[in-house]
Regions:
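Multi-pass membrane proteins that catalyze or facilitate reactions on polyprenyl-/lipid-phosphate substrates
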Residues: 1-290
Length: 290
């Protein structure tokens, strides 16, 4: 039973939206933002439900890529114990090093988002027109990079320079809603010539520390968040996390299956359709978001 007024349908839709869109290159923030606003989630409700859905999708990714995650964790210990000039690093240590190099940029972007730029800028970037425009624009950029990028580079070819560039691209996604963090990092990796499977895999792996930080930040913010209208409870959060886990795991499997067989074009076309739909319904959506 779903307590305190929140319907199971509300919880189910928010969780499925987050789970399906977090790892696909189609902007989870735009989808969750619109879904939350349409359902009237505010204050503590929104913080709790978003933190729970983020946690569910994070666990899904960690489980799906458990071998890579395990190798990276062991590689991190290897990095700490191995002087720079000593023996060659294992594949796990090289992966851990690239993740470490790529991760901070999203956190830097979050600091900028929260504390530096004026509120008027964030209001403008959060408008339906800005979200629609970035959804279409960065979809076109993914299309270009996917068509231009080769398929000659794989996991073993990842350099610190490449990790730096892929990581730096996350700044755009953090600052501009609708960009898609996973989408922009896959775009950067494809532009650098990494094969599609590798681009998708690395984009998701470097998202793990970021999503963990976002989830923790959201949970820490529960105490100070104003009460929401529906009275979301911890039980609601657990339901959302479980559903987001299932849908997130399924979406990762779908993505990895598709990129092994075809290009990113289906996601590009979806972004175009979403952007056009947002613009077409802008009087209604603008009122909901604004």
């Amino acid at each position: 039973m779903v307590p305190d007024g929140m319907s199971f349908l509300q919880l189910f839709l928010i969780a499925v939206v987050q789970g399906l869109t977090e790892w696909l290159p189609i902007s989870s923030s735009a989808h969750v933002l619109l879904a939350s606003d349409f359902m009237g989630l505010v204050g503590r409700d929104e913080v709790l439900i978003n933190a729970a859905s983020n946690t569910g999708t994070l666990i899904a990714m960690l489980l799906y890529f458990r071998k890579d995650v395990g190798a990276a964790i062991l590689g991190g210990f290897e990095l700490a114990a191995t002087p720079v000039t000593k023996r060659p690093l294992s594949a796990g240590a090289r992966l851990a090093r690239c993740i470490i190099v790529a991760t901070p940029f999203a956190l830097i972007g979050a600091v900028i988002y929260e504390s530096i730029a004026p509120e008027t800028l964030w209001t403008a970037l959060r408008s339906v027109y800005a979200v629609a425009a970035s959804t279409i624009l960065f979809g076109a950029l993914l299309w270009w990079a996917d068509a231009r990028g080769g398929q000659s580079r794989s996991e073993g070819d990842m350099t610190l320079r490449d990790a730096f560039l892929i990581g730096a691209s996350q700044l755009v996604a953090v600052i501009i809603p609708g960009t898609s963090r996973s989408g922009i990092t896959m775009t950067a990796a494809r532009a650098l010539g990494y094969e599609r499977v590798e681009a998708a895999r690395f984009a998701m792996l470097i998202g793990a520390p970021i999503l963990a930080a976002v989830s923790l930040y959201g949970l820490m913010g529960l105490a100070g968040a104003p009460a929401g209208g529906e009275g979301a409870t911890i039980a609601d959060g657990l339901i959302v996390a479980a559903i987001a886990f299932v849908s997130g795991y399924a979406s990762i499997g779908l993505l990895m299956t598709l990129v092994r067989k075809m290009s990113f074009l289906p996601f590009v076309l979806y972004r175009f359709a979403l952007g056009i739909a947002l613009l077409a319904t802008s009087p209604i959506v603008a009122g909901a978001i604004g």
